[in-house]
Amino acid sequence: MDNSRILHTELCDMLGIEYPVLLAGMGGLAGEGHAAQPKLVAAVSNAGGMGVLGATGLPLDELRAEIREIKSLTDKPFGVDVLLPEDLSVSPPPNMSLVKLKRNFIPKQHIDFVEKLAADYGVPLTEIRQELVFSVEHSKKQIQVLLEEGVPLYCAGLGIPDWLVPMAHEGGMKVLGLAGNVRGALRHKKARDDFIVAQGYEAGGHTGRIGTFALVPQVVDAVAPTPVLAAGGIGDGRGLVAALVLGAVGIWVGTAFLFAEEANITDIHRKMITEANEEDTRISRVWTGKTLRQIKNPIQEAFDSSGLRPLPMLVQLLLMMDLINSLAKAERHDLLCAPTGQIVGMLKETKPAKQILDDMVNGAIKLLGETLPTKVKIES
């Protein structure tokens, strides 16, 4: 990065970072690692952006260990993303075994479907009997770890963290919430979040139904003066400039950083995204019960054509958990969820995270300082 050319917004001052680029807190499903792990988080922070750890579902000891690993790799600010599935219509008790949870909450036809899938692919289906670590109760315990470890930024990928904002602010931790529509953004504003990410339909992972270009300016207007970041379909300097023009103070970037050397994804996932184009993603509720964009695969296609109704969040994940872990154990990563945004078609090369960030920021600087002034003339 040319240190004489700095791209700076109010977000940089509020978070103590050089460039208005945040790594999306990309997590993983049971049996798969989280893409935004400590090495990637630290690399983005060290490059001048802000890395965010994807921590949903991590056991408390692993969460604490990963936060401390990040601290050992960088002295720059970073964040942690934990989903808060507070909007469940069915919330399994935290101390109930997974086997009993299934018996109590999951319809037989759904279980039969998963068992048939496992048989069709020749994967032994092993029941998991560990503690359910993706729950409301567990999320609250994770937040306590963040406060104890002095994490600068908490990110709510799902859910409205109204109950924790006062506690976070008292502990010196800022709060960021993601929204896929204006209604959700207003709920985050009411909860007094410090920042709101307006995430468009194009994004990978859990996403909504409104496109980024339509969503961002509406959220900016609705929640002013709360700072807004843009997400969804942003992968280079052009996307960064567009976000700023729409009124955002920065960007929340996931898919572009899947191409980082430090990203914790399997070789098969990396091959899939490298070969994919903009038409190769699908939105499905098969994995978690929430709409989630991923590279299309046979498991997703089978569920979406089965006629089965997706179950509420957590319950759907509980349904799929044994299959996910069994597929991972059998190294059938080609059948597992690969969250990816529509921007994937323009990203082909694996690079260090620093180069990805540098290219993005330098591209934006060139557009703002050189390209646009020669292409756009304002005459009186």
Residue spans for each PLM region:
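Active-site entrance/lid segments in N-terminal catalytic domains of soluble metabolic enzymes
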Residues: M1-V223
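Acidic, glycine-rich active-site loops and adjacent beta-strand->loop/helix elements
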Residues: V182, Y201-E202, G233-I234, A256-F257
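Conserved active-site-proximal phosphate/metal-binding subdomains
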Residues: L40, M96, K100-I111, A214-L229, ...
